[in-house]
């Protein structure tokens, strides 16, 4: 019984040590990525800004058509298109 308890304690100790070492390694990796992230973020924001501006411009000019609410003062039109 004492041998199995010691074996279980040794396994538990090894698991704890492994989790501590992996946690330390992950924290180091996170620090490295956060140090590099601001530089990468500025470059990627500049690349993303151009397509987003084009997309917004197209969306604004795209008409949205729905059933007429008589906002265009043409009660017989049936469909209103707003830009």
Curated annotation (Swiss-Prot):
Q: Name one GO molecular function term.
A: hormone activity
The keyword tRNA processing appears for this protein:
no
* A Pfam family matched in the record: Hepcidin
Bridged cysteine pairs (disulfide): 65-81, 68-71, 69-77, 72-80
GO biological processes: defense response to bacterium; defense response to fungus; intracellular iron ion homeostasis; killing of cells of another organism
| Tissue localization of expression | Highly expressed in the liver and to a much lesser extent in the heart. Also expressed in pancreas.
| Presence of the UniProt keyword Disulfide bond in the record | yes
Q: Where in the cell is it found?
A: Secreted
Which stretches are tagged as propeptide in the UniProt entry? 27-53
What span is annotated as the signal peptide, if there is one? Answer: 1-26
The entry's function note states:
Seems to act as a signaling molecule involved in the maintenance of iron homeostasis.
Family, as annotated: Belongs to the hepcidin family.
The cross-references to PANTHER family, in alphabetical order and at most eight, read:
HEPCIDIN
According to UniProt, the name of this protein is Hepcidin-2
Upper lineage is: Eukaryota, Metazoa, Chordata, Craniata, Vertebrata
